[in-house]
UniProtKB/Swiss-Prot annotation:
Keywords tagged on the record: Membrane, Photosynthesis, Photosystem II, Reaction center, Thylakoid, Transmembrane, Transmembrane helix
Main subcellular localisation: membrane
Function: One of the components of the core complex of photosystem II (PSII), required for its stability and/or assembly. PSII is a light-driven water:plastoquinone oxidoreductase that uses light energy to abstract electrons from H(2)O, generating O(2) and a proton gradient subsequently used for ATP formation. It consists of a core antenna complex that captures photons, and an electron transfer chain that converts photonic excitation into a charge separation.
One BP term from GO: photosynthesis
Name assigned to this protein: Photosystem II reaction center protein I
Amino acid sequence: METLKITVYIVITFFVLLFVFGFLSGDPSRNPKRKDLE
């Protein structure tokens, strides 16, 4: 049960890091599709 909890925390942290890095490096000049989603 502890292994499952640790795995869940790792996956959540991984997705949070992906979101933060994508948000910081996703400027409109390099990612024009982001503006269409807003």
